[in-house]
Amino acid sequence: MQQRGVTIWLTGLSGAGKTTITHALEKKLRDSGYRLEVLDGDVVRTNLTKGLGFSKEDRDTNIRRIGFVSHLLTRNGVIVLVSAISPYAAIRQEVKHTIGDFLEVFVNAPLAVCEERDVKGLYAKARSGEIKGFTGIDDPYEPPTNPDVECRTDLEELDESVGKIWQKLVDLKYIEG
C-alpha cells in the first residue's frame, strides 16, 4: 500500500485525552495496514529529551526535537502521531512549517475536567505549589486558533474524536476511506 507521510500533532492540556485518542487512532490505522510511529510527549521526555526541564526554552527545545524526528519520518512516508501538550502557539507553528504535511488536532477539555481526570495528582501538586510552571495552572497554554481538527473530549465519545481525525486524513488524501 502506497501511503503519504503526515504528522498528526495532538495538543492540549494534561488530562485532555491526547494519549487516549492517539492510542485509538493508532489501532485503527494499524488495523487498516498503515505504517506509523507514535511520539508521546512523556515517553520522549524520558529518552530523546532527557535532561530538559520545563522552562519555556526547554519546552521549545523539546517540541523542536519532536518536530525534527516527525519531519524525518513524515518525509519517508510514515504517519506520525504526536501526543504532546506543546503549550506555545509559536513553536507549534514553527514545527508545522518545518514538517509541511501536518495536521494540528486540538484536544480540548475544560481545565476542571482535566483536573478531574488527573490520576497522577499533578494538578493538585501544582495548585499546592509543589510543582511550579505547570501548564494551565501557573504556566500558560495557548490554544490553537485554527486547528485542522478540534476534539471536545468533554462533549464527544472517543469514537467521534477518532472519526473526525480519520475523516480529515481521508479528505486530504493521506489515507483511503
From Swiss-Prot:
Pfam family, one: APS_kinase
Residues reported to bind ATP: G12, L13, S14, G15, A16, G17, K18, T19
Primary enzyme class: transferase
Pathway(s) the chain acts in: Sulfur metabolism; hydrogen sulfide biosynthesis; sulfite from sulfate: step 2/3
Domain of life of the source: Bacteria
Keywords from the named record: ATP-binding, Kinase, Nucleotide-binding, Phosphoprotein, Transferase
Record-linked InterPro entries: APS_kinase, P-loop_NTPase, Sulf_AdTrans/APS_kinase
Reactions accelerated catalytically: adenosine 5'-phosphosulfate + ATP = 3'-phosphoadenylyl sulfate + ADP + H(+)
Cross-referenced NCBIfam families: apsK, PRK00889.1, PRK03846.1
Function: Catalyzes the synthesis of activated sulfate.
PANTHER family according to UniProt: SULFATE ADENYLYLTRANSFERASE
Entry protein name: Probable adenylyl-sulfate kinase
Phylogenetic lineage: Bacteria, Bacillati, Cyanobacteriota, Cyanophyceae, Synechococcales
Chain's gene name: cysC
